[in-house]
Amino acid sequence: SDSAALFPEYVTRAVKQGMEYANLLPSIVATTTTIQSMDYRTITASPSEDDKELKPVVEGAQIPQTVVRTQDNLVKLHKRGRMLVSSYEALRFQKLDLFTVTLRQIGAYIARAQLKDAVDVLLNGDGNDNALTPTSLSSKPTYTDIVKLWGELAPYELNTMLASTVTMQDLLNIDEFKDATAGLNFQGTGKLVTPLGANLLHVPSLKDKTIIGLDKNCALEMVQAGDVITDYDKLIDRQLERATISTIAGFAKIFTGAAKAASYTA
């Protein structure tokens, strides 16, 4: 029917497709927690360097312990949404595919906004005294600086790097990043990798001249309150149909040491 274009299930499906297409979150989020409330307090563990070694335990001796506790502050959740308003004429005389493109684009906007929230938590913390202190570089990043970032992240693995457009341009001009194998991978898959094997992700919302390196397997938790929410109604006196799409999500750090940052001014 004419109103099928704004049918809630169709809207939800199209928006999710757009979110998945533009979604970099699976590349930086270790786990996703779905809740049915607006309040959520995550857990944390802060093992010392000695704890991470797991030294031998003699028979009958006490086994060392790692303490897991809840965080002091709640995870900050953000509601993101958009209303799509369409006239009866637009629905009646236009192809459904055009509305699908529009809805997918709304989904892409939501995914990018959530990525911005995630990067902000990585850099500035989630309110539990766990903001990053970027290492200051004297000039544009060099291969030595990237290796140093890799070393600072140990014992975690540097498998993901985040950079803005300007920073990406500086990184890709490093001689080691022009490696033929890396270039071939980019041409074949569209994915950038570093000489150290870490995936290099383009995050336009990240502050320029700042690099974030992380272990995606244990750095960040995504918390979402339910799924994509869609509501639909009609304004008969104006012959308009409306659909609202919204999501509620937030982010929290899991292991603070699993992410490091570097910045430069040159």
Predicted regions mapped to residue ranges:
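Sequence/fold signature of self-assembling virion shell proteins
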Residues: 175-266
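Alpha-helical scaffold segments that mediate packing/assembly in large oligomeric complexes
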Residues: 80-153, 264-266
